A protein has these predicted regions:
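Compositionally biased, low-complexity repeat tracts
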Residues: 44-47, 120, 171
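Conserved short S/T/G-enriched processing/targeting/catalytic segments and their helical context
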Residues: 1-104, 110, 136-151, 155-165, ...
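Short, conserved aromatic-histidine micro-motifs
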Residues: 165-180
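Long, charge-patterned amphipathic alpha-helical coiled-coil/hairpin "stalk" segments used as oligomerization
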Residues: 110-143
Length: 199
């Protein structure tokens, strides 16, 4: 699986992720994987995804599609509601054009998008989960198989660390150290918050 984290501090946000890809017992390290960065970018947004390796290629394809480029499909990640609406708009596209299997649990109240992701941008740090629920975080969060270790590490250093990048990198390092499906090196991206959000 993975360790993907976001952190916010001192007017900046950071998203970071480990670099291993695994298929059951088989692991593909960054040494062998030419595309090991688990974070993709779209406009001013960085998105880290866990789960199926296909998710990243699918979203790269969606973001590069003519309909998105020409704004016929609007991708807006500036708030909880706009992220929800963007994923709600994308859901039928994922089903029809990318053959998403939306079936998850029989008792789920909605079809699943099957994607768990973290987003970092000038508007803050957000999490998107499989039923398109969106959470905005005030300090930090993590997803993936190393998330529990990452959250604990970020909690332990948040008050003393000076930067969002330091917090995020320590989170990924903890996930990679203690979770067998996460591994270094990491990738990270820092974004300055808009003035109205940074306060």
């Amino acid at each position: 699986m993975s360790t993907v984290v976001v952190a916010k501090k001192a007017g900046k946000v950071c998203i970071a992720a480990d670099s291993i890809t695994s298929f059951g017992d088989l692991k593909l390290s960054s040494y062998y994987d030419a595309a090991h960065d688990k974070i993709l970018s779209h406009d001013e947004n960085y998105i880290g995804i866990v789960g199926s390796a296909a998710h990243q290629l699918v979203l790269e394809s969606v973001f590069a599609s003519k309909k998105v480029i020409e704004k016929k499909i609007d991708i807006d990640f500036s708030s909880r509601l706009s992220i929800f609406e963007s994923f709600r708009t994308l859901h039928p596209v994922l089903k029809e054009k990318y053959f998403l299997n939306a079936k998850d649990e029989d008792d789920d109240p909605y079809e699943s998008t099957q994607i768990d992701a973290l987003i970092a941008n000038p508007f803050g740090i957000f999490g998107v989960h499989s039923l398109r629920e969106v959470i905005e975080y005030n300090k930090f969060w993590a997803i993936g198989s190393g998330a529990e270790y990452a959250i604990g590490a970020m909690f332990a250093v948040y008050d003393t660390a000076e930067t969002a990048e330091e917090i995020a990198q320590l989170g990924v390092a903890a996930g990679a150290e203690f979770n067998n499906a996460s591994s270094m090196p990491l990738s990270s991206y820092v974004v300055e918050l808009q003035q109205s959000v940074a306060k």
